[in-house]
């Protein structure tokens, strides 16, 4: 804090400098809210000035650019904050950190929105966020190593991989809580995961062969909505090209900072032609999301799986296929799901419905796995469903900062831990 900094350095605070610090704080408060919704790209310096009640030049007296304001907002929350594990009174300490984060106004909203928006390499906070993930991974690995030496982490766990998956699932849980604050809560989920980490990997394997008749799988409820389009083939082809180019723009520039003029210029058509196919940018966004769901392979066909175990073990293949064959669709989903956490975003209801359906479906899948004896009795199907969805989304976000990350390999390792081979 500015006051604390002045006290520590012995700097004498004058009335003018105090007023300046207060104004800077007000600018950062307003910017933080605007960077969450409508988002960094869609927010101008004039928007920030209006929110604070200053002129454009009044803001420029404190910050030279919007980029400088963004970095100041990010630094406000500091670097990765991990206590010395030896000072933690109970457990691994991750629950205490999550509780502390939950008490920081705007933390959840800002970092969830920024994690997706800054994933694009051209974003001014990209390098800071990428470095933050590296810093978090290194510190968390050391933290888990100390915890394992104290008997709080099961023997045989790959600590660096566990640290990476923990950070990814944590990001995903924060995102889920913003869409489904009732069913998903970050702190209890982390507390339950902490108890599971105390067991060796693959604990609780069932003895004997699998059942002759596996438990029935739930009806798939992840299908995209219809986007029925009539008309001539040329018109349908142009509509498809518009959706494809809009997908690329939304993935790289975000929805908020992409205009219909931008889309028209990318496609090479007039705005009137664009509006002939889509009445508004919201309609175009809906078509992009529908096309994404229709093309990507994360909506696994349950009918093709013979059992819950088989279904869950094939998820890694789908993730690898998505990253290799449809990286743009993975990108647009990651960016938009983070951007749309604000309730007034046009895509908020879409992601809220989709997450609710996905959690219900995977809860039923894990219940079937438990009925088959594949999911150990000490694991809760509701928790496992939320953790899997959060992990997958968090891994995709991290993949956008590090394209060498193998999302499929981490999903496979997680499923192997949750569904151990039969003894």
Please report, for each region that a protein language model flagged, where it lies by residue.
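Helix-turn-helix
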Residues: 22-26, 30-72, 238-241, 245-287
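Short, basic, alpha-helical segments at the C-terminal edge of helix-turn-helix-like DNA-binding modules
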Residues: 75-81, 290-297
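C-terminal peripheral helix-coil segments that are non-catalytic and often amphipathic
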Residues: 1-12, 97, 101, 134-138, ...
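Amphipathic alpha-helical packing segments from all-alpha helical-bundle domains
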Residues: 105, 123-150, 345-372, 383
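Amphipathic alpha-helical segments used for helix-helix packing
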Residues: 103-127, 325-348
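Hydrophobic alpha-helical connector segments
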Residues: 72, 82-110, 159-163, 301-331, ...
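Hydrophobic alpha-helical segments that form the core
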Residues: 4-6, 110-112, 156-176, 186-196, ...
